[in-house]
Regions:
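Long, contiguous bundles of hydrophobic transmembrane helices that form the permeation core
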Residues: 22-140, 243-342, 370, 374
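Core transmembrane alpha-helical segments of multi-pass membrane transporters/permeases
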Residues: 120-165, 179, 183-192, 196, ...
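Membrane-interfacial loop-to-helix junctions in multi-pass transporters
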Residues: 64-70, 138-144, 170-187, 215-223, ...
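Hydrophobic alpha-helical transmembrane segments of multi-pass integral membrane proteins
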Residues: 177-210, 228-243
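Transmembrane helix-loop junctions in multi-pass membrane proteins
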Residues: 3, 7-18, 157-166, 196, ...
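Re-entrant/interfacial helical elements at transmembrane boundaries that shape
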Residues: 1-13, 25, 200-213, 228-229, ...
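Transmembrane helix interruption/hinge and helix-loop junction motifs
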Residues: 15-17, 81-88, 197, 218-219, ...
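Hydrophobic transmembrane alpha-helices of multi-pass, membrane-embedded glycosylation machinery
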Residues: 93-101, 189, 207-210, 247-252, ...
Length: 375
């Protein structure tokens, strides 16, 4: 989820890469929970059965064979814990990947035949996995470099002209000082920008022009930046561009537009999660208060409460959008569940009591309807 943007977030906030990873833990789990519930409900609605595939190696068998590939990923975090910069951490992780590739003949980046003198040095080097890896990495970095360079120009113009502050003033004026409206306007801006540019560029641009509006309303800086980054990521699955669903359709051979619509159906509950970050005074608990240092003094009770409310809100929205709880839900029950999901996001006591009451009513209607159907 984070990708290269994690390093940029760390640079903006002047925090460590590990703090960025920490902030992403609960939001990522909530997003996966959304997808799991959506798919599980589809399975129950349409009566899907298990599919038996051909004989393939189990995940455990493959892990036992190729466990060493995980070392390069783990080593990035290990080197950063030792105080290395992100650049050096990635460099030494690459060295670890090269070294561990020699543990098996079929994964080595430099063919054994070269060392055994059974292959010409030059030809063997040209056909080696190392050269192909370097070639692929060099090609892939061009896209990131060009994106960051282009975004850097935009950020420079916005900063030097004061457009960022002016833009924030415009947003605050239109929102009338309302945090809810400011968050909605900011989400729309990030979403629109994200339709045209990649995630990293979208985050960089909006962190300069949109984040100050949220910060001006006393939203913690790290929460404002994660709000923007979250919507920059979600723009990847949003029509009309929807780059990720189009890529998935190309891999599976499915229809791009049908894949996009299905993906769009799965994501609405996830769009509500970032609003917990900025609307609720305890919402930063979903980001584990933004750093390991702050987490050490955190109120775990408030973190547990806000996480529980977020989970219930997601479950209400998922069941409402899918139209299924214990059985097929009618329009009235679906409306109650969706309304409950939205009400739970708003941090007022009355709204959350109302949200839980609507969920209780919906559950009662579903249970009674199921009993009548079985009678």
């Amino acid at each position: 989820m984070l990708g290269a943007a994690a390093f940029i977030i760390a640079e903006f906030l002047k925090i460590s890469y590990l703090d960025v990873l920490l902030m992403a833990v609960i939001p990522t789990l909530l997003y996966y929970l959304t997808l799991f519930l959506m798919v599980e409900i589809d399975v129950r609605k349409f009566g899907m059965k298990d599919v038996v595939f051909g004989q393939i190696e189990s995940a455990w068998s493959l892990t036992k064979k190729y466990w060493f590939h995980f070392l390069s990923l783990v080593s990035i975090i290990a080197f950063m814990l030792l105080g290395f910069s992100p650049e050096l951490s990635v460099f030494w992780a690459t060295v670890v990947a090269l070294a561990t590739s020699f543990l098996r003949r079929d994964t080595t980046l430099i063919p054994y035949e070269i060392f055994e003198r059974r292959a010409p040095l030059v030809r063997g080097a040209l056909d080696s996995g190392l050269l192909k890896a370097l070639q692929g990495g060099s090609t892939a970095v061009l896209n990131v470099a060009a994106t960051c360079a282009g975004a850097g120009i935009i950020v420079g113009v916005v900063t030097l002209t004061g457009l960022g502050l002016k833009f924030s003033s415009i947003v605050l004026a239109y929102a009338g000082g309302s945090l809810l409206l400011t968050a909605i306007y900011t989400a729309l801006i990030v979403w629109i920008v994200g339709l045209a540019v990649p995630v990293t560029a979208s985050y960089i641009i909006c962190a300069v022009i949109a984040a100050p509006a949220l910060i001006a309303l006393k939203v913690p800086e790290f929460a404002a930046h994660m709000f923007i980054f979250y919507y920059a990521v979600l723009s990847e699955v949003s029509p009309p561009t929807a780059l990720s669903p189009f890529a998935a359709a190309a891999i599976t051979g499915g229809d791009p537009y049908k894949t996009t619509l299905q993906c769009w159906k799965y994501t609405p509950p996830a769009f509500l999660v970032p609003f917990f970050f900025v609307l609720d005074p305890h919402g930063s608990g979903l980001l584990l208060t933004g750093s390991f240092k702050a987490l050490a003094d955190a109120d775990w009770g408030s973190i547990a409460v806000i996480t529980f409310i977020a989970v219930v809100s997601i479950m209400a929205l998922v069941t409402g959008f899918q139209g299924w709880m214990y059985r097929n839900a009618g329009p009235a029950v679906r409306l109650l569940l969706i309304s409950a999901g939205f009400l739970l996001v708003y941090p007022e006591r009355w709204s959350r009591i109302a949200g839980f009451c609507l969920i209780a009513v919906s559950m009662a209607v579903q249970i009674l309807g199921r009993r009548r159907a079985l009678a």
